[in-house]
UniProtKB/Swiss-Prot annotation:
Keywords from the UniProt entry: Chaperone, Cytoplasm, Disulfide bond, Redox-active center, Stress response, Zinc
Protein name: 33 kDa chaperonin
CDD domains documented for this protein: Hsp33
Species, as recorded: Pseudomonas paraeruginosa (strain DSM 24068 / PA7) (Pseudomonas aeruginosa (strain PA7))
PANTHER family in the cross-refs: 33 KDA CHAPERONIN
Bilayer-spanning residue ranges: none
């Protein structure tokens, strides 16, 4: 299997169904390198990364897709972002003492809520919310699409702390098959075959092998893979803008409280940005410079 992170689209020639597969290794490892997550949390975060990458691949937009899960349990927050140029990042909040070995989504995130946000550069923001119901994240997402006025969509996800993989099938508007019964039969046939794929096979097999294993009797067109990379969009400029939005009085108060330097830490990548009194003065003097103060991880 290729070790380059990628998503790859495929189409069935004889029916109105498309698919997407995603493989994350390096970017997944970079996300995990930023925080020492327990294994069950790392696995769930990997599934979220794969899911967001799959969803982003089905959309034609310029902007950001955010997948966020909140709960009252040991993992109160999971958050993953995937941009339209296929850059991903993610984080989790957890209570280590409350996490048992082998815990799944329902144990980690009871009474959870999943929010899907599509934030385009231009146009209206979209947000969908669904309860975290189901055995796993794939089932929860599949249920969301089944219960909303969306195209029928199914997910298969797995992650093991080293690799995150995902498979998506989505029924398209009627074109090749017009008869509703034929469309439903085709959809059920393809998803039933996908249900035979084990979690271990999803992690171990490359895309071509997975598709042959499931659909060797179907006519499938596999498109060129698209790269995915880890990238954190934090910057010194964004941090400076956040301080400006607080106002000069609050920033000066923070300088006093933090003994002469305001510290801003990125929750995603742990990058640290420091602003001393001179930096803050420049911000509010309109100098347009955030200065050369050191940053560190």
């Amino acid at each position: 299997m290729s070790h380059s992170d990628q998503s790859q689209r495929f189409l069935f020639d004889d029916t109105d169904v498309r698919g997407e597969m995603v493989d994350l290794e390096r970017s997944y490892s970079e996300v995990l390198a930023k925080h020492p997550y327990p294994e069950p949390v790392a696995q769930l975060l990997g599934e979220m990364l794969a899911a967001a990458s799959l969803l982003c691949g089905t959309l034609k937009f310029d902007g950001l897709l955010v997948l966020q899960a909140r709960s009252s349990g040991a993992v109160p927050l999971l958050m993953v972002e995937c941009s339209s140029d296929r850059q991903v990042r993610g984080l989790a909040r957890y209570s280590a003492e409350a996490i048992g070995a082998g815990a799944g989504m329902q144990e980690l995130m009871p009474e959870g809520v999943l929010t899907l946000t599509v934030d385009p550069v231009k146009g209206q923001r979209y947000q969908g919310i669904v309860a975290l119901e189901g055995v796993n994240l794939a089932e929860c997402l599949s249920n969301y699409f089944a219960s909303s006025e969306q195209l029928p969509t199914r997910f298969w996800l797995n992650a093991d702390g080293r690799r995150a993989r995902g498979l998506l099938l989505q029924q398209l508007p009627a074109d090749r098959l017009k008869d509703p019964e034929a469309r439903e039969a085709s959809w059920q046939h393809l998803t039933t075959l996908a249900d035979t794929l084990t979690a271990e096979e999803l992690l171990a097999l490359d895309n071509e092998t997975v598709l042959h294993r499931l659909y060797h009797e179907e006519t499938v067109r596999l498109f060129e893979p698209q790269p995915l990379v880890f990238h954190c969009s934090c910057s010194r400029e964004r941090s400076a803008n956040a301080l400006v939005s607080l106002g000069q009085a609050d920033c000066e108060r923070l300088l006093e409280e933090e003994e002469g330097a305001i510290t801003i830490d990125c929750q995603f990548c742990n990058q640290r940005y420091l602003f001393d009194a001179s930096d803050v003065a420049q911000l509010f003097a309109g100098a347009g410079s955030q200065g050369p103060s050191a940053t560190r991880h």
